[in-house]
Amino acid sequence: MDVQAEDLFRDVESDAFVNESHGGTGFQQNFSAWPGAFQVAWPLTNHQDLASETQDNGNKSGGDEIDVSLCDSQQQGRSRTSSLVNGLLTELYDTYRGGAGCYYFRQQDSVDSSTEASGSDAFLSRSNPESGFLQELSERQSSRHQMLYLKQKDCSELKAIKDELNRRIAIQSAKLLRQVKQKDRLQHKVQKNCDIVTACLQAVSQKRRVDTKLKFTLEPSLGQNGFQQWYDALKAVARLPTGIPKEWRKRVWLTLADHYLHSISIDWDKTMRFTFNDRSNPDDDSMGIQIVKDLHRTGCSSYCGQEAEQDRVVLKRVLLAYARWNKTIGYCQGFNILAALILEVMEGNEGDALKVMIYLIDKVLPDSYFANNLRALSVDMAVFRDLVRMKLPELSQHLDVLQRTANKESGGGYEPPLTNVFTMQWFLTLFATCLPNHTVLKIWDSVFFEGSEILLRVSLAIWAKLGEQIECCQNSDDFYSTMGRLTQEMLEDSLIDSNELMQTVYSMAQFPFPQLAELREKYTYNITPFPAPVKSASFSGRTSKMRDSDEENEIDEDDVNANAVGCLGPFSGFLAPELQKYQKQIKDQKEEQSLKASNIAELSPGAIDSCRSEYHAVFNSMMMERMTTDINALKQQYSRIKKRQLQQINQVYIAADKGPVSCILPSQVNNSPVINHLLLGKKLKQVNRSKNALHLPASKSSLLANEETKAKQNSPWRTHIRVHRKNIARAKGELGHGDTIGLIDEQNEVPKDQPDTSKETEETAQPPCSSAGEETSLDRTVMKVDGRSPEPVYQDENANVTVVQSKLEALELSPDAETEVSLEMSQTFQESQSDSHSSSSESESFKKSPKVQVFSPFPSVKPLKKSATARNLGLYGPNSRTPSVNFPHMSKTFNKAANGTTGSKKR
């Protein structure tokens, strides 16, 4: 795209002096419409210059019409230029010449002239009486004095003043109208040029669907997608060989910065008052001293020397303002170079320079890029070395050979990666100290739109350009001397062409750079940053065998610790103190083995430790031992989690007391046993119970029972379970379904007035006699204490398997077993009737007239109250108002399963 700026400026200058009043519909006809306006003689016949001006202006008026239709010709352009010169000369001579007839020309003004001589200052200085009146009136500041001044004048003088005011208003109105028309024409031309740029951008684009939506504008348009549309178009302009024009750069950078500050809701006026107020920040003295030291080292010529003292003051204010804005970063060496270049683009405006600096450091560059430890910078340097291996493998291998050779020749010293010395300076100053100014500005334009990825791309392009001369170096000394010469050539703009450099940057790979995000994430957690406080005495080098940082492919210690601890889940907190203690021990050993006062981590990021393999081996063995000892803790935690889940389920059931009543528990709908999924796939252990049987004396068993009773008597959960089982047994008894659990609980309940029940408790603690095929074993001991149902006490790691086996056996009962269970239930029920008078009376009344009550399997403190509304709705059963509803009842198969389970527990 080649746009001729001279043609545009010629059109603009010619359109600035368009005569709109000499046509048939000019200002002469409009001016005569003013009431009381004085008569003006238009000298179109006597004065030769004015006649020629009229003729030329007529031609110019026609030229304007053709200019609007974009069909100008060269001859008409020349006529406009001649009319411009003639009009200026005529205006000057007619306004200020003396002699006869000058008063006649002094009483009129060229309405359509836009020069300073014919402005308001020119006719205000004229010596007519009306102008004198207006001048005296303007000297009265207050309206009261002006009123008094006008009251002193007669009617003729007031009419003359009025006519003079009308004449001036008419002249200014004509000028304003002409300026508005000129603005419309210029906006039309700007839109035409923007359309040309849009067509060029779409022509050189990749013909994607997104590229068809490109629309170039100088400023973001109003609307939801106005800024994004402008951003995409300017990003495409920055990719062109010529880049963003220097006339647009200030406006483009400020637009980006303003949009960022608006997105984070910053009150800029308040920020300006805070950041540029020296009195509110008295603790910046030390920072100001450091800034003053760096100001004299600024590379920009406009900030060096005795003549640039005022510019250095402005630069210091901007640097201090950013340090107050971002106190986390404060001031970093290299900021003076960045701020100087920004101030140069912003034409010395402090506020605008601070805006752009905030946008560049806080938004564009990665976090902690200029922090105390320069972590993000060290990450980018490590990533850049990987990119050099990928894109420039021959150069990378050659530099590795030079580095290894230098390490061998140094006799125990360390040679950092050869690219680090130069790449660090390039990244810190964003190439402001190694490339010419116009090339740096193009790079910055791309950085503002594409991000910090441009820095890596430009570095790759520069090393690719320098690679041919670097490959001739035989050792590291030759490399550094060659790079010193090449750096000077780059700065003098004799080695790298800016257009070629930017084309290489954009054609290198697609955006974003492949694998760049993965590499940055990898080195973010696998890198040793530059230490903020450098300790020269506490750290030292090592004489043992070391590996180059470029060849590092192992996992860092932090990653090993994080992965190992993270795999343990909830037990990671147990290992954290031990890991910290172990890492401290390893660190102390390293310090004892050190011999020199230099640390590799301080010289280069990603340095390798000499005892890494030993550290990994010891750490892995420790982790394996720790994991084996924590299996029991894992089992205990799993059992606690399971109990909590059961408690939550019971709480949900209890809370649902107001819901629809059902005689079937949710836990009894599915008769399948609960299986521990951690034990799936584990073979059942065949236990010979006859050989492993262990007979405990009665005294020891009674002691165990008493201890178990004391430990569990005051448990609120046990009390809740006992009440829950009693309610289930009582409800089933009322419905005609027997259950021995509640009856046994009632029979073995310890009343307050019977002190001899402790003996019965001791007797029930004895293991009952089983059938001929079963004997008491060590693996399982059945205890029954405090009126509770028997529960097994497990003492073996296969306890969960035994529970599953016992439940499975309980589900498959023979008919004989069912008969025994029913007989035992009837006997137990009769014994309970003979023991308690209240219970016998209730049972007799139940036998005589069985009354089905509302069954609620949940314990409740107060009896349920029946409401009339619920009874009418049929919630308590059928009545006269509601039809008969068949409510669900317990099936026979369910009764058998429940009774069989109870019988198995009793055995």
Curated annotation (Swiss-Prot):
Pfam families: DUF4682, RabGAP-TBC. The keyword Coiled coil applies. Disulfide bonds: none annotated. Residues 583-645 form a coiled coil. Residues 749-762 have a biased composition (Basic and acidic residues). It comes from the Eukaryota. Keywords: Coiled coil. InterPro entries: Rab-GAP-TBC_dom, Rab-GAP_TBC_sf, Tbc1d30_C. Residues 892-907 have a biased composition (Polar residues). Residues 243-451 form the Rab-GAP TBC domain. May act as a GTPase-activating protein for Rab family protein(s). This is TBC1 domain family member 30. It comes from Xenopus tropicalis. The lineage of its organism: Eukaryota, Metazoa, Chordata, Craniata, Vertebrata.
